[in-house]
Every structure is written in structure tokens, then in C-alpha cells.
Amino acid sequence: MKVLVADDEIVSRRLIESSIRRWGYEVLVAKDGTEARQILLAPDPPHMAVLDWLMPGVDGVELCRQVRARKDEAYTYILLLSSKKTSDDVVAGLEAGADDYIAKPFEPQELKVRLRTGKRILCLLDQLTAARETLRDLAARDQLTGLWNHNSILEMLEKELARAERQGTSNGIVLADLDHFKQVNDTFG
């Protein structure tokens, strides 16, 4: 699983990077917010990001907002690091889109556990997405034959007719009927 570590303090960044690498993650690093933004807004963003709040270029909170504004990409779990420790700061970070918040200084074990929590949440999200796709497919097809059901066919037909109208082309539709379908239905359900 890929994790981005973005921190402008070189000692902190290298310590976090080496710890995360030791825990079995693939690590990408960014020395400032601008570099982190390029990585996070790229076509294949990392699964998780550990972002420092105060960085040159784009700060961690603004970066959270920009990442969350993209609805079309896979979800990135964001852990925000900061020396800011007040309740208002934590709330501001979470409201900006961070999934978790760690106040500096922190123990490496705390980071390890929070990353493990993020990994668990991302795995659950993947399972939920797969289940949704399965349910969507089951709802669109006849269970016995595996063929598209009436509503799905009408929906596809509507899309194809709209596309043909936009492109100025025509569509052909074939209607097929199965003789003695009642016997098939009575036999197989």
C-alpha cells in the first residue's frame, strides 16, 4: 500500500519515512505542499497520506480540501500532523477533510496504529465498493438466465437513443421472442 509522507522538516520526514517503510508500506515523499499536491492529484494517487499542517507552498489543511474536492478518484486516507494541539485546530483539520490527526511530537507506535486503522478502513471501503457493484449487477440481470432485465434494457435503450441523437446517427433494435417461454418459466422458475 502506497503512503505519501509530506513534511518540510527533513529530519521529521526521514524519521517518518523510515518508520513507515519498516512497517511494510511503499513510501512516497514530498518536501513541501506543492510537491505533495502534484502526487495526490495525479491519476494514481497513494492510498494514504501523512501530511504536515505547516508546509511551504500549500499547507496540509488546504491540501486536504483540494484532495476532497476531487470526487472522481479513489479515496485517499489522510492523516494530518501538526504541532497545533488545541481542540479548535483538531476540528479545523478534520473539517478540512483529514481522516485523523496527530499532534507533534508523537510516538512512532501511535503513527503505526493510526496507519493500520487507515488501512483497515480502506480495505472495508474496497469491500463495500465490490459489494455495491455485485448488487448493482444482480439488480440489473435476471437471476435465472443472466440476461438484462426489463428496466436495465429500457435504461440502456434510452442512453443509446440519446447518444444517437447527439451524434446524428441512427439505431437499430432487434426484438426477439422465445416460443413456449411459459414452459421454460414453469420448469426453471
Which functions belong to the PLM regions below?
Residues 7, 52, 82:
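Active-site residues of response regulator receiver
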Residues 136-155, 176-189:
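Conserved nucleotide-binding and Mg2+-coordinating catalytic segments in signaling enzymes
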